[in-house]
Amino acid sequence: QEDEKVGEMIDFCMDNDRMIAAICAAPMILGELGLLSGRAAVCFPGFESNLHGADISDAAVAASDNIITSRGAGTALEFAAAIVDYLTGEYGAGEDIVLNMQYPYEFE
């Protein structure tokens, strides 16, 4: 069921070129709204048919303009790193933070 406030927030972000980040099954909401058409996107396996018009890959994270999507809990660190990259405007900034956490994680 559509939530009016969520819809308003998504509209605001799209109208003002603000970041939208969705993980697990949440990217399907963006797909159903037609916001992923022509954009790279990923989601939890099995929900891909809801990413209408998206360029779907098997990557852990996909970033396209102001929209960042990720597969699920197991990709949360890479998802967070992509968000940091977007917010800082500096590719690799998020990876540096994750690596400094001393977590043995391999980025794709």
Question: Whereabouts are the PLM-identified features?
Answer:
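Active-site-adjacent pocket-lining segments in enzyme domains
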Residues: 1-108
